[in-house]
Structure formats: C-alpha cells, structure tokens
Amino acid sequence: MPNYYDELEIEDFAWDPVARVFHYPCPCGDRFEISKGQLRDGEEIAICPSCSLIVRVIYDYLDWEDYVTTDDEDDGGSVDTPLSNTSPDPAYPVVVGSAEVESQSKTASSAVSSQKEECTSLSDRLAGLQVESGKEDDPVQEHKREDSSDVLH
C-alpha cells in the first residue's frame, strides 16, 4: 500500500484543458496531476512529476461512468468535466480568446478611469477643506497642480 502525502477531493483540483489533466499544487512548486482516463479506469493516485509525492484522489466512481470519450477524443474541443466551485490555479493561466481579453482590457481601463475621477474628486474636496482652514500652501495642492499639468501634455 502506498504512503500518501494527502487525500484530496477531485473538486479541489482544477482542469487544465491544454494538458487535459486535473491538477493541484504540490509543495515542491510543481503540481499533482491525474487524467480523466485514469479516473475512468478507477485509479485514485495523482502524481507530482517533479518529486516523489503522491496524493489519493477522492471521488465517486459512479460520477465518472458518464465519460464515454477517451482522452484522445477530447481533442474535439469539448471538455466534459463535472461542475466545480474551484477556480483555476493562477500559476497556470487558461488562454482565452482575443475578444474576451479585449473585453477584459476595456473593463479594466474603465475601472481605472473611474478611480482617477474619484481621486480627482477627493483631491478637490481636500483642497476646498484646506482653503477653508487656511492651509492653502499644502503639498497635496502642489501635487495636484503637477498632475493636472501632466494630463495636459
């Protein structure tokens, strides 16, 4: 009987559509991996290719009976994985289409511009309070003037 490093549920693993494996971070910095084919065959050991650690994967074999495709047939584009509440590991990003990236870029840029507007509004409010209190020669005011001159260029 092998000596397992840990026991993990399949729901804790993330799906890598490029390598077509479920993966989970390993303490060595690499990742434990197990394929759908291994799960269909009843295997329950995920191996880290960089070190000697193995984990036992806990899953309900009956949930995996529905997978009638082989790993080679999965190249057709559809990935039939169970729903999971886990998100992919940020160390292994998933490539998305250019339209999605462009959309995300526009969303991020609009968020930045709204933050700039909010900062400007707060700076204006602070400047007004400083004028009321008699502290007009303040570094915040000078910084604000420098920023506004940068915007004009």
Swiss-Prot record:
<keyword id="KW-0560">Oxidoreductase</keyword>
<feature type="domain" description="DPH-type MB">
    <location>
        <begin position="4"/>
        <end position="60"/>
    </location>
</feature>
<keyword id="KW-0963">Cytoplasm</keyword>
<keyword id="KW-0539">Nucleus</keyword>
<protein>
    <recommendedName>
        <fullName>Diphthamide biosynthesis protein 3</fullName>
    </recommendedName>
</protein>
<feature type="compositionally biased region" description="Low complexity">
    <location>
        <begin position="104"/>
        <end position="114"/>
    </location>
</feature>
<keyword id="KW-0479">Metal-binding</keyword>
<feature type="binding site">
    <location>
        <position position="26"/>
    </location>
    <ligand>
        <name>Fe cation</name>
    </ligand>
</feature>
<dbReference type="GO" id="GO:0005634">
    <property type="term" value="C:nucleus"/>
</dbReference>
<comment type="subunit">
    <text>Component of the 2-(3-amino-3-carboxypropyl)histidine synthase complex composed of DPH1, DPH2, DPH3 and a NADH-dependent reductase, predominantly CBR1.</text>
</comment>
<dbReference type="Pfam" id="PF05207">
    <property type="entry name" value="Zn_ribbon_CSL"/>
</dbReference>
<feature type="compositionally biased region" description="Basic and acidic residues">
    <location>
        <begin position="133"/>
        <end position="153"/>
    </location>
</feature>
<dbReference type="GO" id="GO:0002926">
    <property type="term" value="P:tRNA wobble base 5-methoxycarbonylmethyl-2-thiouridinylation"/>
</dbReference>
<dbReference type="GO" id="GO:0008198">
    <property type="term" value="F:ferrous iron binding"/>
</dbReference>
<keyword id="KW-0408">Iron</keyword>
<dbReference type="InterPro" id="IPR007872">
    <property type="entry name" value="DPH_MB_dom"/>
</dbReference>
<comment type="pathway">
    <text>Protein modification; peptidyl-diphthamide biosynthesis.</text>
</comment>
<comment type="function">
    <text>Required for the first step of diphthamide biosynthesis, a post-translational modification of histidine which occurs in elongation factor 2. DPH1 and DPH2 transfer a 3-amino-3-carboxypropyl (ACP) group from S-adenosyl-L-methionine (SAM) to a histidine residue, the reaction is assisted by a reduction system comprising KTI11/DPH3 and a NADH-dependent reductase, predominantly CBR1. Acts as an electron donor to reduce the Fe-S cluster in DPH1-DPH2 keeping the [4Fe-4S] clusters in the active and reduced state.</text>
</comment>
<dbReference type="InterPro" id="IPR036671">
    <property type="entry name" value="DPH_MB_sf"/>
</dbReference>
<dbReference type="GO" id="GO:0034986">
    <property type="term" value="F:iron chaperone activity"/>
</dbReference>
<feature type="binding site">
    <location>
        <position position="48"/>
    </location>
    <ligand>
        <name>Fe cation</name>
    </ligand>
</feature>
<feature type="region of interest" description="Disordered">
    <location>
        <begin position="69"/>
        <end position="153"/>
    </location>
</feature>
<feature type="binding site">
    <location>
        <position position="51"/>
    </location>
    <ligand>
        <name>Fe cation</name>
    </ligand>
</feature>
<dbReference type="GO" id="GO:0016491">
    <property type="term" value="F:oxidoreductase activity"/>
</dbReference>
<dbReference type="GO" id="GO:0017183">
    <property type="term" value="P:protein histidyl modification to diphthamide"/>
</dbReference>
<dbReference type="GO" id="GO:0005737">
    <property type="term" value="C:cytoplasm"/>
</dbReference>
<feature type="binding site">
    <location>
        <position position="28"/>
    </location>
    <ligand>
        <name>Fe cation</name>
    </ligand>
</feature>
<dbReference type="InterPro" id="IPR044248">
    <property type="entry name" value="DPH3/4-like"/>
</dbReference>
<comment type="similarity">
    <text>Belongs to the DPH3 family.</text>
</comment>
